[in-house]
Every structure is written in structure tokens, then in C-alpha cells.
A protein has these predicted regions:
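Long, Lys/Arg- and hydrophobic-enriched amphipathic alpha-helices
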Residues: 1-128
Length: 128
């Protein structure tokens, strides 16, 4: 991340993923957050079927936030994905919701509804 953010370029960085702080991981997931998915099915056997299943784990936001600050980003903020979209793309969301495009509306709901990705994913952002 330090290499990606280096070089003195100006602009915004937006990282969207699901994650926790280290304290949240230690308290709520002491065995870790690594999971495997094969054919859209959750598996606890993360070392089996290597190459034919997806591996995933939570991002540690409190390890990434200081990197943004050290690289000169300001207004560094961690928000739930739904709040991030409402704050930064509210008018675009409104256009989608009133467009009559059922597919687009469904995708937007999946990204922002708290029962779907809205509460599970977060956005870490900063500007320089």
C-alpha cells in the first residue's frame, strides 16, 4: 500500500472491503477471519482444494489508516459502505433508484442495504 500511495500524486484513495480493527479481531475472531469458498459454499478447510477455491479474510483497518496519514492524506475516514455511498454519491443513488432500471436498483440495494453489503463492507478514504 505504501508503494501504491507513494510518488506524490494528488487525488483520492478509496478502499472498499470488509474488515475489522485488530481489537475487534482479537475479541470477536480469536481464531482469525480466514475462510474458504468453493462453488459459493463456505468451507473451514482453507488449506484443502488449493487452486480451486477462493480464500478471504478481513482487512485490518487500523493497520491501513496510519499508512494513509503517513503518506500525506487528509480527511482520512473509515465509514460503513452504505454511509460512504450516501455521503459521496447520494445524487447518483437517487437517479438510479428513480430510473426504473430494476437491475440497477437491485445492485444498488445489495451494495447499500444493511442486511447485505451495506453494513458488512466499509470504506477507508482520504484526499491529498
Amino acid at each position: 500500500l505504501e508503494r501504491l500511495l507513494g510518488g506524490g500524486w494528488s487525488g483520492a484513495v478509496i478502499l472498499l472491503d470488509y474488515g475489522k480493527t485488530l481489537a475487534q479481531c482479537l475479541e470477536g475472531s480469536p481464531a482469525g477471519t480466514a475462510r474458504a469458498y468453493r462453488s459459493h459454499q463456505l468451507s473451514g478447510a482453507i488449506l484443502e482444494n488449493l487452486g480451486s477455491q477462493d480464500l478471504t479474510c478481513h482487512v485490518l483497518w487500523d493497520r491501513l489508516e496510519p499508512i494513509l496519514v503517513a503518506q500525506g492524506f487528509r480527511s482520512v475516514r473509515l465509514e460503513r459502505q452504505e454511509a460512504f455511498f450516501v455521503k459521496h454519491a447520494g445524487s447518483a443513488m437517487e437517479r438510479i433508484m428513480t430510473s426504473g432500471d430494476n437491475e440497477g436498483t437491485g445492485r444498488l440495494r445489495a451494495l447499500t442495504h444493511p442486511a447485505h453489503f451495506g453494513a458488512k463492507f466499509q470504506g477507508l478514504s482520504g484526499i491529498r
